[in-house]
């Protein structure tokens, strides 16, 4: 049983329909990721504001007696809210991978751009295909 090589279709309208379907599907995938990314961005903004407010509270504190108690006691007694924020941030970034979830549509678009470039195609950040002019190699 011989393996046949895959060829481009002879009919240009079939290739055009395939490109339209690919563009539609890519746009759907990137659009579907949008609301999830927005929710994670809002969570990160709330977390950053919370850390900023709590951190500024301790920077504004002018007490020098911080160095007179052990670090563990300081973080578990006087800075408990900052310690909790630190562990929530660690949970968000290390366990849930929020940073990857936020930039997921950008990663998908960039990888599609890389895969489409040999075919003189590209795509924008929304998944719309862009046809680039074909590169002509001039023989010397």
Swiss-Prot record:
Membrane spanning stretches: 42-62, 78-98
Organism superkingdom: Eukaryota
GO molecular function: protein phosphatase regulator activity
Keywords assigned by UniProt, alphabetized: Cytoplasm, Lipid metabolism, Membrane, Nucleus, Transmembrane, Transmembrane helix
Membrane topology label: Multi-pass membrane protein
Subcellular location: Nucleus membrane; Cytoplasm
PANTHER family, sorted: NUCLEAR ENVELOPE PHOSPHATASE-REGULATORY SUBUNIT 1
Record function comment: May form with the serine/threonine protein phosphatase scpl-2 an active complex dephosphorylating and activating lipin-like phosphatases. Lipins are phosphatidate phosphatases that catalyze the conversion of phosphatidic acid to diacylglycerol and control the metabolism of fatty acids at different levels. May play a role in nuclear membrane dynamics being crucial for early development of the embryo.
Protein name as it appears in the record: Nuclear envelope phosphatase-regulatory subunit 1 homolog
